[in-house]
Amino acid sequence: MLVPKRVKHRREFRGKMRGAAKGGRNVDFGEYGLEALESHWITNRQIEAARVAMTRYMKRGGKVWIRIFPHKSYTSKGVGVRMGNGKGAPTGWVAVVKREKIMFEVGGVSEAVAKEALRLASNKLPIRTKIVSREEVGGQSNEG
């Protein structure tokens, strides 16, 4: 699973998720991508479940790019712990995904296989998503 190697601060503020993503809105690596239609925290377990679903469907063909990384830690207090006494212990890691962010990209397979793999991945995520192609949202061309 994806976790940071080291962090400066173990406990972070929750932050705000207003507006659309500033970067990562183009399909830059593969031919097809999975775009978020709403903002949400995506846990490292959800990212891994989506990755496994895609790679199992595509078998040995193609390549998957994960464009999000869980940099933010989230905390929780134990069950039955009274209020106060500081912030809880870090529980897991999340990626802050804003709307219009491309989360996953797929390349090297046919359109039907790519769309089905991304559909299976979207079922593992807690947000509404859209499958987009490089032509729809733009992206860097691979020609030199």
From Swiss-Prot:
One of its GO terms (molecular function) is rRNA binding. GO terms for biological process: translation. It holds the Pfam family Ribosomal_L16. Keywords: Ribonucleoprotein, Ribosomal protein, RNA-binding, rRNA-binding, tRNA-binding. Transmembrane segments: none annotated. CDD domains: Ribosomal_L16_L10e (cd01433). InterPro entries: Ribosomal_uL16 (IPR047873), Ribosomal_uL16_bact-type (IPR000114), Ribosomal_uL16_CS (IPR020798), Ribosomal_uL16_dom (IPR016180), Ribosomal_uL16_sf (IPR036920). The keyword RNA-binding applies. GO terms for cellular component: cytosolic large ribosomal subunit. Belongs to the universal ribosomal protein uL16 family. Part of the 50S ribosomal subunit. PANTHER family: 50S/60S RIBOSOMAL PROTEIN L16 (PTHR12220), LARGE RIBOSOMAL SUBUNIT PROTEIN UL16M (PTHR12220:SF13). Binds 23S rRNA and is also seen to make contacts with the A and possibly P site tRNAs. This is Large ribosomal subunit protein uL16. The lineage of its organism: Bacteria, Bacillati, Bacillota, Bacilli, Lactobacillales.
